[in-house]
C-alpha cells in the first residue's frame, strides 16, 4: 500500500512539473500536507517490502500487476532526479559533465542515493556525498566527505535526497559563499520553499515544483 501511494505521489509530482504547477501548494489547498503524500526519490524501506511481496507472489506463480507497476515507477524516480539535476545545471549555463555536485543523502552505495551518485558519475559529473548520521568515510567510499562544508566547497550544485534534521536547517547564505556561481539547489524532498532559496541567490529546482508562473 505504501509503495502504491508513493508511486501515485511521484507520478502526480512529475505531472505538476510538466504542467508548471506546484504539487506542494496543491497538497496544502486540499489540506493533504502530510509526508505520506509527498513524493520522494529515497524509500528503501518500501522497496524492501515490495520486493519481498513480489518475490513471494512469484514463488506462488502469481502476478501482482499493481505492486509491480508501483515499484517500477518508484525505481524510475532516480533517473528523474538525474534529469532534474541536469536541467537545473543547464539553466545555470553549466553542463552535467564535469559539474561538481554535493549530494546530501545516505552513505550507502546500494541505496537510491548510491544509484544516483553512480549515474551522475557515469555522465561525467564529479560528486561528493555527505551523510551526517553515517560513520562511513572516504576509505570505504571515495565520494564520502566527513563534513558538510567539505562536501559543498567548490561545487556547482547541491542535491538534497534525504531529510535528515541537519539538512532542514541549512544556512543557505554560508553554503552559497562556498560554492561556484551561479549556484544551484535541487530539492528532491520538498524541504525548502522556492522563494526562500531564490532570495539567497540560488537557482532552485525541486521535485514536483513547477514554477506556478504563467
Model-derived features with residue positions:
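Structural/interface elements that position substrates and couple domains in central-metabolism enzymes
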Residues: 1-214
